[in-house]
Curated annotation (Swiss-Prot):
Family: Belongs to the GMC oxidoreductase family.
PANTHER family listed in its UniProt record: CHOLINE DEHYDROGENASE, MITOCHONDRIAL, GLUCOSE-METHANOL-CHOLINE GMC OXIDOREDUCTASE
Taxon lineage: Bacteria, Pseudomonadati, Pseudomonadota, Gammaproteobacteria, Enterobacterales
BP term (GO), one: glycine betaine biosynthetic process from choline
Top-level taxonomic group: Bacteria
Region feature (Disordered): 182-201
Pathway where this protein functions: Amine and polyamine biosynthesis; betaine biosynthesis via choline pathway; betaine aldehyde from choline (cytochrome c reductase route): step 1/1
Gene that encodes the chain: betA
Catalysed transformations (reactions): choline + A = betaine aldehyde + AH2; betaine aldehyde + NAD(+) + H2O = glycine betaine + NADH + 2 H(+)
Keyword Chaperone in record: no
Protein name: Oxygen-dependent choline dehydrogenase
Length: 559
């Protein structure tokens, strides 16, 4: 079989490309996905409050593990990635955060990326979005991605935690994706008006899958990209145990994510020559940056008992769950219709940072992100972590076998800045939690526990308990330097007919969750592939901190 375009990976980027490219009826597209369909009757992926469930199995999760992380007590750490139509948008936490404007302005200072400034990217964020309260200079109202804003009457702990952040001297913002990201405020989520997860399978593929020029093949595990010289001409994949090959007339578009995209390139002969030769993989093109520059967000949970019976603890008890499930199933409302990350914020921990370097997610229950280690009492917590770590990792293929997971090392916490930021984050969080807005609710500190105070004690807590935020990125970075893998249009350097379009091409990780930005990247490059003029540059105003102090005097100073 032959198609104009072959897309590898039906995730946050691949589904965007499949939908946009097939808007032209004379273009044929094959979309290959290693996982299965996004079963709409499976509450594990469709109910926002059930977000922990897909991470606990392997039906929707590749369930990668890192190599022993040398600065984290040699722990092998989780690296969950989505498997199935929707990719990681099928199993993520549904937080709709775009990053800070300064992230993109910083990208645009890099050679070859001049058109990736915030005002160049903002029109594509708007194009992708339908926000439930309508459009403005920052938000769209006609896009495929349903974005829900928090509503009146949601859990009172959200409001108390935001107010505590403001009382601690930090800014308030009414829109973390609007004029000013810096500060504490409500958090948008990718949830439909009917209370369902708004994955890219639902938002994009639902409108495209009936087109005659789009072919979707699930349970299709990519083996390698096929080349004639330096030109990509097709893909070899397995449908179950059966090997298949397909040809691409125009381009192969690799959208397999920050772990699998470099793995597939390397297995296909595009990557660091020494690595490939050591595995007896024929070298098609020596490209040393493939799999390098790997970045992620690391986070911790600071947990508190709640003196008032207002947390979500009762929802964790099995005898309350049938009622919650029924309300969600038949009405699309209630606890089940929210991911329960409805407030958070971004702050600068020190004046040396020009834009926020710490992110908060507030949660009105005390539990790990993957659903483990729930505290058996009313509680609440802050997820807190640094945003732009200087630590760099790598992804390396282990063999020619498409079924073997790659070697992954994030090299977490490898710089002194990492340790300083995380110590600061714990101490700042404790100061926030001590503010009067939380006096009514705040019980004892469950984790880390008040006995953990010195730098050495904090460091050991971090080494033992910090976890991934599931934001791998930057492993096929765009740019023009010697370690860049693609140019500003996603085209692989030194190759023809081959692009990478996903979170792996970010040159530096953004300040926030990755899904919204990955969708934006795909929307922007889709116009390039179609040889369309870019959308007109936005003229929206946006906040730059300049010489503004990190914070005002707190209402209640640290004791």
């Amino acid at each position: 079989m032959e198609y104009d375009y072959i897309i590898i990976g039906a995730g946050s980027a691949g589904n965007v490309l499949a939908t946009r490219l097939t808007e032209e009826s004379d273009v044929s597209v094959l979309l290959l996905e290693a996982g299965g369909p996004d079963y709409r009757l499976d509450f594990r992926t469709q109910m926002p409050a059930a977000l922990a469930f897909p991470l606990q199995g392997k039906r929707y999760n590749w369930a990668y593990e890192t190599d022993p992380e040398p600065h984290m007590n040699n722990r092998r750490m989780e690296c969950g990635r989505g498997k199935g139509l929707g990719g990681s948008s099928l199993i993520n936490g549904m937080c709709y955060i775009r990053g800070n404007a300064m992230d993109f302005d910083n990208w645009a200072t890099m050679p070859g990326l001049e058109d990736w400034s915030y005002l160049d990217c903002l029109p594509y964020f708007r194009k992708a979005e339908t926000r439930d309260v309508g459009s403005n200079d920052y938000h769209g109202a006609t896009g495929p991605v349903s974005v829900a804003t928090p509503k009146m009457g949601n859990n009172e702990l959200f409001h108390a935690m935001v107010e505590a952040g403001v009382q601690a001297g930090y800014p308030r913002t009414d829109d973390l994706n609007g004029y000013q990201q810096e500060g504490f405020g409500p958090m948008d989520r990718t949830v439909t008006p009917k209370g369902r997860r708004a994955s890219t399978a639902r938002g994009y593929l639902d409108q495209a899958k009936g087109r005659k020029n789009l072919t979707i093949v699930t349970h299709a595990l990519t083996d390698k990209i096929l080349f004639e010289g330096k030109r990509a001409v097709g893909v070899a994949y397995f449908k179950g145990e059966s090997p298949q090959t397909v040809q691409a007339r125009r381009e192969v578009l690799l959208c397999a994510g920050a772990i699998a995209s470099p793995q597939i390139l390397q297995r296909s002969g595009v990557g660091p020559k020494d690595l490939l030769q050591g595995l007896d993989i024929p070298v098609v093109h020596d490209l040393p940056g493939v799999g390098e520059n790997l970045q992620d967000h690391l986070e911790m949970y600071l947990q508190y008992a709640c003196k008032e019976p207002v947390s979500l603890y009762p929802a964790l008890q099995w005898f309350n769950q049938p009622k919650i499930g029924a309300e969600w199933l038949f009405s699309g409302t209630g606890i089940g219709a929210s991911n329960q990350f409805e407030a958070g914020g971004f702050i600068r921990s020190r004046d040396e940072f020009a834009w926020p370097n710490i992110q908060y997610h507030f949660l009105p229950v005390a539990i790990n992100y993957n659903g483990s280690n729930a505290v058996k009492e009313h509680g609440f917590q802050a997820h807190v972590g640094s945003m732009r770590s200087l630590s760099r990792g790598r992804v390396q293929v282990r063999s020619k076998d498409a079924r073997e997971h790659p070697s992954i090392l994030f090299n977490y916490m490898s710089t002194e800045q990492d340790w300083q930021e995380f110590r600061d984050a714990i101490r700042i969080t404790r100061e926030i939690m001590a503010q009067p807005a939380l006096d009514k609710y705040r019980g004892r500190e469950i984790s880390p526990g008040l006995e953990v105070q010195t730098d050495e004690e904090l460091d050991e807590f971090i080494r033992t308990h910090a976890e991934t935020a599931f934001h791998p990125s930057c492993s096929c970075k765009m740019g023009e330097d010697e370690m860049a893998v693609v140019d500003g249009q996603g085209r692989v350097h030194g190759m023809e007919g081959l692009r990478v379009v996903d979170a792996s091409i970010m040159p530096q990780i953004i300040t926030g969750n990755l899904n919204a930005t990955t969708i934006m990247i795909a929307e922007k490059i889709a116009d390039r592939i179609r040889r369309r003029q870019p959308l007109p540059r936005s003229r929206a105003r946006y906040y730059v901190s300049g010489n503004t102090p990190v914070r005002k005097a707190p209402l209640k100073p640290a004791s």
